[in-house]
C-alpha cells in the first residue's frame, strides 16, 4: 500500500502547508475488517481539534475528486502526539537533544531497541547517549538499520 500513501501524501501536503502546518505522516492500515487512512499534522505550538477538522474537511473534499483508494475507509486526521514518529531528515534534525526510541532491523551492539538522547544525525549515522545502569554510553546506529524511530516521553 506504499503507492496509496505516496499518492495521498502528494495530495495532502499542499493542503496542509497552505494552512501553515506540516504533514508528518500518512498511513493506510487495516484494523479488523476496516481500513483507516491516518494523516498526522503538526505546527509550532501544536495542533488543536479545529485544525484537524479543517484539514479533514479539505482533504476529504480533495479525495472525493481524486481518490487513489479503491476500498471504503475512514479518514482520520490527528496530531502525531508526544511520541511523534521520526521519518525524514528534518524530523531527526529537530529531535537532536531530545529523548528518542529507536528500533533496528538488525542488532547493533547486541541490541535492537534503544532509548536515549539523540546527540547527532547524518544521512548515514546517528549517535545516541543511552543509560546502562549508572553509566552513560554513546552508541552509533547506522541509519539504514533503523526500522522505526520516534520521540519518547521520559517519566
Curated annotation (Swiss-Prot):
It is found in: Cytoplasm. SUPFAM superfamilies: YhbC-like, C-terminal domain (SSF74942), YhbC-like, N-terminal domain (SSF75420). Keywords: Cytoplasm, Ribosome biogenesis. It comes from the Bacteria. One of its GO terms (cellular component) is cytosol. Belongs to the RimP family. Required for maturation of 30S ribosomal subunits. NCBIfam families: PRK00092.1-2. This is Ribosome maturation factor RimP. It comes from Exiguobacterium sibiricum (strain DSM 17290 / CCUG 55495 / CIP 109462 / JCM 13490 / 255-15). The lineage of its organism: Bacteria, Bacillati, Bacillota, Bacilli, Bacillales.
Amino acid at each position: 500500500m506504499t503507492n496509496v500513501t505516496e499518492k495521498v501524501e502528494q495530495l495532502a501536503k499542499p493542503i496542509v502547508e497552505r494552512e501553515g502546518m506540516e504533514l508528518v505522516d500518512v498511513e493506510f492500515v487495516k484494523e479488523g475488517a476496516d481500513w483507516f487512512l491516518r494523516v498526522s499534522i503538526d505546527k509550532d505550538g501544536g495542533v488543536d481539534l479545529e485544525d484537524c477538522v479543517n484539514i479533514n474537511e479539505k482533504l476529504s473534499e480533495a479525495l472525493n475528486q481524486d481518490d487513489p483508494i479503491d476500498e471504503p475507509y475512514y479518514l482520520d486526521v490527528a496530531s502525531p502526539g508526544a511520541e511523534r514518529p521520526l521519518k525524514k531528515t528534518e524530523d531527526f534534525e529537530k529531535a537532536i537533544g531530545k529523548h528518542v526510541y529507536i528500533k533496528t532491523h538488525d542488532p547493533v551492539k547486541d541490541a535492537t531497541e534503544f532509548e536515549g538522547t539523540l546527540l547527532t544525525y547524518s544521512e548515514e549515522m546517528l549517535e545516541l547517549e543511552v543509560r546502562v545502569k549508572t553509566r552513560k554510553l554513546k552508541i552509533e546506529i547506522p541509519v539504514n538499520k533503523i526500522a522505526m524511530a520516534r520521540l519518547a516521553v521520559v517519566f
